[in-house]
């Protein structure tokens, strides 16, 4: 059995805690309106925090096997999130603001499935492509277009809204930067800090079970905050 890289599991677990915090604030402020708090710095933090997951995923893809299979699984989990939010909206349990189009799981899945197209490129070319994707994606954030069919890339149509939106630009760029880091830092495909009894067990556990935690945490948070709001 292949030994896991414990520090990447711990980093993924720590990143999950940050995202859970972001979703808790979303539920309190935007979904139920029980807390009036929305400073500018937090908006910047929230809008860019997903890059952490893309970087970690990019590092990890250089260590694992079957990225297309794994990516398809993650994408399907993301599609499940979209289906659930759409069902909640259609059944009247939530407003349109809850809908998820191209969320972080769908983006991660697409990046993994696309990785074989970039895998043979040398690292300088990957970094050049990543820089172009990131620059284009950051520019697209301030633009709107009259066509909807390139939304997955970051070309947002007029009136578009999504509670979780991670287009390929700039996020595929962050993923490719992570892949370059993975090549550099994990050439031997093993931990850089080999320990008999690695620390941060809780974070490691979260990192190993990140997909399940991501799928379950928001319904639990929404239910708890909803009960709090009603009380």
Q: PLM ranges: what are they?
A:
Residues 1-231:
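Alpha-helical transmembrane segments and their immediate juxtamembrane cytosolic regions
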């Amino acid at each position: 059995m292949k030994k896991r890289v414990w520090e990447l599991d711990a980093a993924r677990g720590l990143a999950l805690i940050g995202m859970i915090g972001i979703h808790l604030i979303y539920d309190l402020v935007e979904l139920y309106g029980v807390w009036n708090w929305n400073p500018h710095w937090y908006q910047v933090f929230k809008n860019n925090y997903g890059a952490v997951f893309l970087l970690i995923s990019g590092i990890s893809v250089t260590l694992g096997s079957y990225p297309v299979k794994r990516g398809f699984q993650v994408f399907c989990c993301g599609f499940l999130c979209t289906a659930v939010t759409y069902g909640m909206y259609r059944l009247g349990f939530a407003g349109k603001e809850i809908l998820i189009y191209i969320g972080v799981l769908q983006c991660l899945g697409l990046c993994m499935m696309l990785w074989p197209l970039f895998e043979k490129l040398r690292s300088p070319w990957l970094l050049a492509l990543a820089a172009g994707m990131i620059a284009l994606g950051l520019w697209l954030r301030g633009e709107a277009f009259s066509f909807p069919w390139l939304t997955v890339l970051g070309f947002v149509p007029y009136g578009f809204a999504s509670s979780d939106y991670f287009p390929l630009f700039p996020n595929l760029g962050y993923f490719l930067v992570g892949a370059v880091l993975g090549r550099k830092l994990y050439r031997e495909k093993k931990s850089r800090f080999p320990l008999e009894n690695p620390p941060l067990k809780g974070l490691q556990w979260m990192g190993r079970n990140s997909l399940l935690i991501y799928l379950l945490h928001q319904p639990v948070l929404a239910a708890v905050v909803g009960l709090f709001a009603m009380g």
